[in-house]
Amino acid sequence: AEGIDTSAVAEVDGASGTALIEVDAAGANRIVVIPGANGWLTPDFTAAQVDRFSGASIALAPLEVPPDAVVGALRSARAAGMRTIVNTAPVPPDGLPEGLLDLTDIVIANEHEAGLLTGGAVTDRASALTAAHALRGRGATSAIVTLGADGAIWSTPDGDGHTAAYPVTPIDTVAAGDAFCGVLAAG
């Protein structure tokens, strides 16, 4: 229907994955993820799906599914010559699995996620840059730490920098990180 290939949709027992999003008076959000069917994804299943994207140049993976399934997808994407981007939302309770960042061309984390992953509070541009360097030190080729209204800090093999955010008055920041990742992937 409408040219959408649904042949890879797998029906499993249980409910669909759900995210409950609470938005405060300032427009900031807090998200609780209930994996549901997302938790059934396996490395073999995700790796097998990469062939469906022949001709694609970028694989973008969030962590709303089991991290080992993300690793399987990244391995296959890399083998297919794709550039890989990982959005660290939400950070798994046990942190990132071994090898995930080694398969990542660009890792994207917000201040909270970057702090959880690097063990240091990210409160300003300097601490965001420290976190970006730490993420690169763990294997990612490049790292971006988003800072909400203060834009983003980035670190690549060619250098580091800051990109300002477009000034807006937010009503609701739900999906801001997802939108950032999508726009980055689209180039």
Which residues make up each language-model segment?
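Beta-strand->loop->alpha-helix junctions that form or flank phosphate-binding loops
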Residues: 7-16, 87-89, 134, 144-147, ...
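Short clusters of small/polar residues that mark proteolytic maturation junctions
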Residues: 34, 121, 164-165
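Short, acidic/turn-prone active-site loops that include or flank metal/cofactor-
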Residues: 36-38, 89-91, 112-114, 166-169
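Conserved beta-alpha-beta core of the PfkB/ribokinase-like small-molecule kinase fold
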Residues: 56-130, 150-152
